[in-house]
């Protein structure tokens, strides 16, 4: 999972946008800030994608404490699988957990190249993996298939060409963190 870095000078903050009043604008700005990548599943956001403004802590949604730091652009399916504040108490079941902006998120959530699974190195990190359903069967298969495609690019064109291609086409790249881990490249 790739860490999301929030911008303290985001237009969302500087213009004082609020949810739900400015929901569409917030979603568009979050998509751009996240380079058109789902904050949870690292899947590409396209014009045809169904995207939600996700409230990481669902208990804050539409309260006075809800703010930019709690909002992420996520694929609708990822949001559905996570559940809501009323859906089977998933939020309460997975406390203690780290959030997607945590400074050492990428060191605490690891990727197993063999199985295609994410795992946390501690309880809080594993709770995030479980809470976000990062090891959903279909998602895991997508990651493995994407790795094969990128491996083919590397075999045909070399690592340097492929890395430069991925950097130039950053908004088209899925599963960035996994590619960084597997191929030892920085995207």
Task: Give the residues covered by each predicted segment.
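Extended charged
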Residues: 1-15, 20-29, 44-47, 62-72, ...
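Coil-to-beta-strand transition motifs
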Residues: 36, 48-49
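Short N-terminal amphipathic alpha-helices
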Residues: 41, 49-54
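Cys/His-clustered metal-coordination modules, chiefly Zn-binding fingers
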Residues: 32-39
